[in-house]
């Protein structure tokens, strides 16, 4: 779910950037999304959005699905999840968290005018 996803982000980036920095970034980080991603981090958000869309097509509820995960020194991972939907959603979130941690953060792409830049 979205709360767990925020913890996974913090785990993957070792607390270097607050989760709220990703809530209004580029064209895809945050609610909705359209156009071409503005950079690598925004592409991570689009991939995560697409993953959640795929989860929805499978009958899952990604924004509300609670799963078991662990935050280790090498980052987050999904723990012993047998239910397919929960595993799928957890994998979406873990992959995105690592993607966020690797991607550079460009302050100029935070809180952009999406009507102009995301067509």
Swiss-Prot record:
Localization annotation: Secreted
Domain of life: Eukaryota
Miscellaneous comment: Activity and lethal neurotoxicity are lost upon modification with p-bromophenacyl bromide.
Enzyme Commission code: 3.1.1.4
Protein name as it appears in the record: Basic phospholipase A2 notexin
InterPro entries given in the database record: PLipase_A2 (IPR001211), PLipase_A2_Asp_AS (IPR033112), PLipase_A2_dom (IPR016090), PLipase_A2_dom_sf (IPR036444), PLipase_A2_His_AS (IPR033113)
Coiled coil regions, renumbered to chain: none
Signal peptide: none
């Amino acid at each position: 779910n979205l709360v767990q996803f925020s913890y996974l982000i913090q785990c993957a980036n070792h607390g270097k950037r607050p989760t709220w920095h990703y809530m209004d970034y580029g064209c895809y980080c945050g609610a909705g999304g359209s156009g071409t991603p503005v950079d690598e981090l925004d592409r991570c958000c689009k991939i995560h959005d697409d993953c959640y869309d795929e989860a929805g097509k499978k009958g899952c509820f990604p924004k509300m699905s609670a799963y078991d995960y662990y935050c280790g020194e090498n980052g987050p991972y999904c723990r012993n999840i047998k239910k397919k939907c929960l595993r799928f959603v957890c994998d979406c979130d873990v992959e995105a968290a690592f993607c966020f941690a690797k991607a550079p953060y460009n302050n100029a792409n935070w809180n952009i005018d999406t009507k102009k830049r995301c067509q």
